Curated annotation (Swiss-Prot):
The keyword Lyase does not apply. Disulfide bonds join C109-C112. Keywords: Cytoplasm, Disulfide bond, Electron transport, Nucleus, Redox-active center, Transport. Residues 89-191 form the Glutaredoxin domain. It comes from Oryza sativa subsp. japonica (Rice). This is Glutaredoxin-C9. The gene is GRXC9. InterPro entries: GlrX-like_pln_2 (IPR011905), Glutaredoxin (IPR002109), Thioredoxin-like_sf (IPR036249).
Length: 192
């Protein structure tokens, strides 16, 4: 090795050991300082994230409940007592004409959830009758099944303007081909 190369290597080694502003080495701080910073900043960040989650999630659920006019169980029971004399078909017709958009649903049904979310996304606040929470659910569901074409699932059943629109397949087909919004406007469920 020549003396010149050796001198250059010694100079580079010496310069690396000196503190330099243009160094590509990571800044030299003690690990204790990093732990202290993490110890100070992490709990407030976790608290902020938790508070945001706690504040936002119930707000979204409450907003959804406010937009969707869910028929309360007590009101439904009053209606059931008053409608005991009527036939099941008259009762379904009365329930279906009570609002611009009415959805007969089951609380655990994923397709019912899809239909309700679609209508809410369009800006419609449907009246929702959860059949699994009604006392006369079996009679109402039997009447709805006779109104639907054979092979259709019993829920969801959507009425627009007091007239039967259909189940989830019909609602989605109308949405895709662009006829759902005009139907909702004609029924008075949408103003825009």
């Amino acid at each position: 090795m020549s003396e010149r190369v050796f001198a250059e290597l010694a100079t580079i080694h010496y310069q690396k050991s000196l503190p330099c502003r243009h160094s590509f080495d990571p800044p030299r701080t003690t690990p204790i300082l990093h732990l202290y910073i993490i110890h100070l900043l992490l709990p407030p960040l976790i608290a902020i994230v938790c508070l945001c989650y706690i504040a936002i999630v119930p707000f979204e659920e409450e907003e959804e409940r406010m937009r969707m006019q869910v028929v309360e169980t007590a009101a439904v029971e009053e209606e059931e007592a008053a409608a005991a004399m009527m036939s099941v078909y008259e009762r379904v017709a009365r329930m279906a004409s009570g609002n611009a958009v009415v959805v007969f649903s089951a609380s655990g049904c994923c397709m019912c959830h899809v239909v309700k979310r679609l209508l809410l996304g369009l800006g419609v606040g449907p009246a929702v009758y959860e059949l699994d929470q009604l006392a006369a659910a079996a009679d109402i569901q039997a009447a709805l099944s006779q109104l639907l074409p054979p092979g259709q699932p019993p829920v969801p059943v959507v009425f627009v303007g007091g007239r039967l629109l259909g189940g989830v397949e019909k609602v989605m087909a109308c949405h895709i081909n662009g006829t759902l919004v005009p139907l909702l406007k004609q029924a008075g469920a949408l103003w825009l």
